[in-house]
Amino acid sequence: MPRKKPFSVKQKKKQLQDKRERKRGLQDGLRSSSNSRSGSRERREEQTDTSDGESVTHHIRRLNQQPSQGLGPRGYDPNRYRLHFERDSREEVERRKRAAREQVLQPVSAEVLELDIREVYQPGSVLDFPRRPPWSYEMSKEQLMSQEERSFQEYLGKIHGAYSSEKLSYFEHNLETWRQLWRVLEMSDIVLLITDIRHPVVNFPPALYEYVTGELGLALVLVLNKVDLAPPALVVAWKHYFHQHYPQLHVVLFTSFPRDPRTPQDPSSVLKKSRRRGRGWTRALGPEQLLRACEAITVGKVDLSSWREKIARDVAGATWGNGSGEEEEEDDGPAVLVEQQTDSAMEPTGPTRERYKDGVVTIGCVGFPNVGKSSLINGLVGRKVVSVSRTPGHTRYFQTYFLTPSVKLCDCPGLIFPSLLPRQLQVLAGIYPIAQIQEPYTAVGYLASRIPVQALLHLRHPEAEDPSAEHPWCAWDICEAWAEKRGYKTAKAARNDVYRAANSLLRLAVDGRLSLCFHPPGYSEQKGTWESHPETTELVVLQGRVGPAGDEEEEEEEELSSSCEEEGEEDRDADEEGEGDEDTPTSAPGSSLAGRNPYALLGEDEC
């Protein structure tokens, strides 16, 4: 018997790599040269994410994979509704990396921040959303699902046939998630479309507006959420923009954590988070406006007096809690009934449905990921009933919540509609899970060309010997300078971890601590008019009246917006557990009418 030859761990690792590459039909050694963190993440993702029948001719990348040993006790698959996006090609990723290293960033004008919805979605084009095909009660479940799959494939084929991958944005390729939207629209009497006030055009697909108000004949309420993250003048300008272009809309301003914009704050608070205690959800700005909109829509067909009484109880409870100076327990009022919908509830209903059945109005909450749908429901209920997370795609199936005996809320998972938005903007909008981005550097460059990130964070150019000298910046330089400032180092070689730094900067932008707000067309020319508008003054007063009063604690964040400390680490955006606590980023300071200055962030010695 021949003597056994020594076989090192390095040789074994190389053997396994070659075996995997042969299985994928790739050439031996194609990826052995890439040993960076991003390269290892890409190799791992490509081993787990492959193309399947849900794509036409394009590779699909599945995000938010959950560990599962099969179906749960109720037959629920945790990966059924995960995000499905088209995968960026390796050549495209490498091209963007080179551009991030070489392209010098130039600041853009204020007019570039103005977004026109007609350029984003091109109403009337194939950039639509899939509709449920016609069906009848004579069809079996298998026939119906097969018909829906064929229709969905045709829908994807039309879009990819009309636009190249470079022009298209990320959008949902998972049919199961679109089925959730169909069911929610069929169940609803009123549809809430929740958008982020920093970029509401991104979250407002005109095709959905036409379908809901036209074909379904339902009322659509546009909720401009997170209004505490934008100047009041900009909020009012967006409100009038949507009223002008979509007259059938009911526009409501909302935020779960209102803040008085007249209150000065510490500019160094970007590195701190504000922990809200007790009755934080009961101070939401907007439930009263939403109630008035629903009363105007139902015109007395539903008794909403119980909802008005609940709002009054929440306001009184919040006021009493402020005066006591103690942390309060959860509301002892009527419990909120939560119903998780099963597969049988997902089956289509009849072509005609009784409106306001049994005196109950059903309000469907739809929108893009990470716009705050779950937080809005918590704000309406007055306490935490829905798990929330910074990770887009956190809501995996729709649930119903009885706000009062006559008001039922329906929470739908976030959906990304097809558009022509730059993918970097989608990343900054929180649509794509940051921890799973293959190439985050161009998104950082997109941000830095629109707000002065280098000056705000007091970054020193990595090649600068004289701090006072001017040096051209590229996206890679910004990431390297932030890694040096924060002490982000790779594990073995102790080099600046630019991937982690880019991840950190993107989280600052998504959280609103690096605030990038887009404007409606013509806002730059009429900015003074909007700042002196009566509704702007009214909004400032309203925010000051319902803002938090002494129930916040600030704690410094040790590891700010970091992720991927080791290979194989998954997304660490944990749910905000705890019934009465909520961690939110502390806003930056500002003026009374124009809003806080979103760019006053760090002092030189803060980190």
Curated annotation (Swiss-Prot):
Amino acid composition bias (Acidic residues), ranges on this chain: 550-584
CDD domains in the record: HSR1_MMR1
Keywords for this protein: GTP-binding, Nucleotide-binding, Phosphoprotein
Listed InterPro entries: G_CP_dom (IPR030378), GNL1-like (IPR043358), GTP-bd (IPR006073), P-loop_NTPase (IPR027417)
Compositional bias ranges of the Basic residues kind: 1-14
GO terms, biological process: DNA damage response
GO terms for MF: GTP binding; GTPase activity
PTM annotation (Phosphothreonine): residues: T48, T50
Residues in CP-type G domain copies: 178-418
Pfam families xrefs: MMR_HSR1
Entry text on domains: In contrast to other GTP-binding proteins, this family is characterized by a circular permutation of the GTPase motifs described by a G4-G1-G3 pattern.
Primary role: Possible regulatory or functional link with the histocompatibility cluster.
Name of the protein in its database record: Guanine nucleotide-binding protein-like 1
Organism, scientific name: Macaca mulatta
